[in-house]
């Protein structure tokens, strides 16, 4: 008889790699030999911030970089849990949540009370429910109701749970860097990672949410919708433990799991529905539809989490899948991409940021077209805030994708790995790509802007009949209208038992809650056609800048050795007629401004369109009255209309907010304009000017024998641009925030 030795379990961690040292952490710049020496000039503090998280500059070991990123992720999660915990704590301690639950259409959500130090209590408005506070627009009240939270105690407990999770995350971050640090092969085991993330995070995550919705949220929301007082609703565990209690609300519970195992699944159609449309009581998606959706998603992801080959020799191999992708025109196709994505975290991050950013923008649009939570659709300030928020997040992620793709090109790109594959072929015909994209941008910009200029001119000359408008020369968005019609009619054939189309934005009825419009068909016309082409123009220009930055990150005709200069450098000397703003970093810098341009027009379009054509009230006899009375179609077709009827007309609330509970927005509007203007000082002025000024100030200090030990230095060119764009965006975003909220809280 022969004995086979058992296969040893693979150890994928190293023990006690980095000692835990508070002395080391207390030393600023401990990660860099030059920074650890301490400051000689004021540039030191800038370099400290620039390099603290640039792990590539700390070490050349990919394993060590991977461990630092992994550990930092736990730190990030800890911060998120603390932040969430604070949100829930405010809901428990400083809010009118329970009052709002009993009258969500009449009471405004508030979870913040301003302390009266020097008269700030003016900001505490009468929001209803016996509460004086600031109206919040985060949508958390609606989310809590959908979760089945009915009292402050549940919010307190969840807040404590968040702090507990934060502590766990901080511990995990320390443990997996100092005590048991994963080896590089663990980080590069993509099949195992895919299986765990798909089946664990997305599959079991969706399944547990579906379970919570079915066993806790559905019964509680059904009782709330029926008008039962929050204080009389049974506690969540009673619904879970007492089947009879559930069966009163959802009869299929009486049958237990028998229908599941006998495949008689239609018995569960009272908890897992396919109604479509919105609930007429809450104006949100049917929660039974949402539970069904999460159950289906869970099944899909649990299957997906078993698709990739690990220890059992069955399933997909990512490397094989990628290398099989060879088209007739793509040479070696995706060969080499596996090596890129397992050795360059910048390349990996670039793809993930592009995906996540696009997803955030998709979420922004679904939140109003298919509002997921009860009473969200009629809370106009929250709807506007959620749209704006998800658009900004998406824009920043997509620009970040351009940034990290360019860093990959500069730091991690290998010409031997990328021979004649899709990336190499993109780089080899980059001139054709960029010049064509540039032509598209000029075409879109000239024509879309030209339509507006034409209309402004005709209106100024009093020739309304010669304008592009719904009442003169029509430019109807026929393709969009066709898609709307298909989506309105199709469910009648594809989902015969559904009550309504997926979104009322396409067509069908007007949904009202109380007398407020939750959602209704969004009619598209000439004004939408015109502004959509401005969207196309700004998106293409942003793409042009970012893509040019990536494709020319390593070299160009102007600077053949660009890769040697690094990711960020101000210029390559004064020759060749000037070489400024050619670094990959500068393309990201310029791309941020166009991202801001693009998104400003998107959120302005959304804000005005919804106020003009969707949001408003319905009288008892069915007459619809919109906030701005449908003025979008005739006003948004000229530049003057945008300036006069949107920006100026709707700024009256923020400009006249002084002395009211909205006065903070008036001050923010003013202050944010100042921050924005302050940015121009950094963007329109050269470094030499400031260095000269500093030297004359230092001379005066020397005369008085009060010269500092740390020599002052002007910001470098790149630092100045970074400070400039940061204040430009911060000022612009905060100005928009104040403008939007003062307006919509006053009229919405």
UniProtKB/Swiss-Prot annotation:
The keyword Transmembrane helix applies. It is found in: Plastid, Chloroplast thylakoid membrane. Its EC number is 1.97.1.12. This is Photosystem I P700 chlorophyll a apoprotein A1. InterPro entries: PSI_PsaA, PSI_PsaA/B, PSI_PsaA/B_CS, PSI_PsaA/B_sf. One of its GO terms (molecular function) is magnesium ion binding. GO terms for cellular component: chloroplast thylakoid membrane; photosystem I. It catalyses: reduced [plastocyanin] + hnu + oxidized [2Fe-2S]-[ferredoxin] = oxidized [plastocyanin] + reduced [2Fe-2S]-[ferredoxin]. Chlorophyll a binds at residues 681, 689. It comes from Cyanidioschyzon merolae (strain NIES-3377 / 10D) (Unicellular red alga). It is a multi-pass membrane protein. P700 is a chlorophyll a/chlorophyll a' dimer, A0 is one or more chlorophyll a, A1 is one or both phylloquinones and FX is a shared 4Fe-4S iron-sulfur center. The keyword 4Fe-4S applies.
């Amino acid at each position: 008889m022969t004995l086979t030795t058992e296969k040893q379990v693979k150890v994928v961690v190293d023990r006690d790699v980095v000692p835990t040292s508070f002395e080391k952490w207390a030393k600023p710049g401990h990660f860099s030999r030059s920074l650890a020496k301490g400051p000689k000039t004021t540039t030191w503090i800038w370099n400290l911030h620039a390099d603290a998280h640039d792990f590539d500059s700390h070490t050349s070991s990919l394993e060590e970089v991977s461990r630092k990123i992994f550990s930092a992720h736990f730190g990030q999660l800890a911060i998120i849990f603390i932040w969430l915990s604070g949100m829930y704590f405010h809901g428990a301690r400083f809010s009118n949540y329970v009052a709002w639950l009993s009258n969500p259409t009449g009471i405004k959500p508030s979870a913040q009370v301003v302390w009266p130090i020097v008269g700030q209590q003016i900001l505490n408005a009468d929001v209803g429910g016996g509460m004086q506070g600031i109206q919040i627009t985060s949508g958390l009240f609606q989310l809590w109701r959908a979760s089945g939270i009915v009292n402050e105690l549940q919010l307190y407990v969840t807040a404590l749970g968040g702090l507990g999770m934060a502590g766990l995350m901080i511990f995990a971050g320390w443990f997996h860097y100092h005590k048991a640090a994963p080896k590089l092969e663990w980080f590069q085991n993509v099949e195992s990672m895919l299986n765990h993330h798909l089946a664990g995070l997305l599959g079991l995550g969706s399944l547990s949410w579906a379970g919570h919705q079915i066993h806790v949220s559905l019964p509680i929301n059904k009782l709330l919708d029926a008008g039962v007082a929050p204080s009389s609703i049974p506690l969540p565990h009673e619904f879970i433990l007492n089947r009879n209690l559930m069966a009163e609300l959802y009869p299929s519970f009486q049958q237990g799991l028998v229908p599941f195992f006998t495949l008689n699944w239609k018995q569960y159609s009272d908890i897992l529905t396919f109604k479509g449309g919105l609930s007429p009581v809450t104006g949100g998606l049917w929660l039974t539809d949402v539970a069904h959706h999460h159950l289906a998603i869970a099944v899909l992801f649990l299957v997906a989490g078993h698709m990739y080959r690990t220890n059992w020799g069955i399933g997909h191999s990512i490397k094989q899948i990628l290398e099989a992708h060879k088209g007739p025109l793509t040479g070696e196709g995706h060969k080499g991409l596996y090596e890129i994505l397992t050795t360059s975290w910048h390349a990996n991050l670039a793809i993930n940021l592009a995906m996540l950013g696009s997803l955030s923008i998709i979420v922004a649009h679904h939140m109003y077209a298919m509002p997921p939570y009860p009473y969200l659709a009629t809370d106009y300030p929250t709807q506007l805030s959620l749209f704006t928020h998800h658009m900004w997040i998406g824009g920043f992620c997509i620009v970040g994708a351009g940034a990290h793709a360019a860093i990959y090109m500069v730091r991690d790109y290998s010409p031997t790995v990328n021979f004649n594959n899709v990336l190499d072929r993109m780089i080899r015909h980059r001139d054709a790509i960029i010049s064509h994209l540039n032509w598209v941008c000029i075409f879109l910009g000239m024509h879309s802007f030209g339509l507006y200029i034409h209309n402004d001119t005709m209106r100024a000359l009093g020739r309304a009949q010669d304008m592009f408008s719904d009442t003169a020369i029509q430019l109807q968005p026929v393709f969009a209208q066709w898609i709307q019609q298909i989506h309105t009619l199709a469910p009648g054939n594809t989902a015969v038992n559904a009550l309504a189309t997926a979104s009322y934005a396409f067509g069908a009825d007007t949904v009202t809650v109380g007398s407020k419009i939750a959602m209704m068909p969004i009619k598209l016309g000439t004004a939408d056609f015109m502004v959509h082409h401005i969207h196309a123009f700004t998106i293409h220009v942003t793409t042009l800048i970012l893509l040019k930055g990536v494709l020319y990150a390593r070299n160009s005709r102007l600077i053949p050795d660009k890769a040697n200069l690094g990711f960020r450098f101000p210029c390559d000397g004064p020759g060749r007629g000037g070489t400024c703003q050619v670094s990959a970093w500068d393309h990201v810098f310029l791309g941020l401004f166009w991202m801001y341009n693009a998104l400003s027009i998107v959120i302005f379009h959304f804000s005005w369109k919804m106020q003009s054509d969707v949001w408003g009230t319905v009288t008892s006899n069915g007459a619809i009255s919109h906030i701005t009375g449908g003025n979008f179609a005739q006003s948004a077709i000229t530049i003057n209309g945008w300036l006069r009827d949107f920006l100026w007309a709707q700024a009256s609330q923020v400009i006249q907010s002084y002395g009211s509970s909205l006065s903070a927005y008036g001050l923010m509007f003013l202050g944010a304009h100042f921050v924005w203007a302050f940015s121009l000082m950094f963007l329109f002025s050269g470094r030499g000017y400031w260095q000269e000024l500093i030297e004359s100030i230092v001379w005066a200090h020397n005369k008085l024998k009060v010269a500092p030990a740390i020599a002052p230095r002007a910001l470098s060119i790149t630092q100045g641009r970074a400070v400039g764009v940061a204040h430009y965006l911060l000022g612009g975003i905060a100005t928009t925030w104040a403008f939007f909220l003062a307006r919509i809280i006053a009229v919405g």
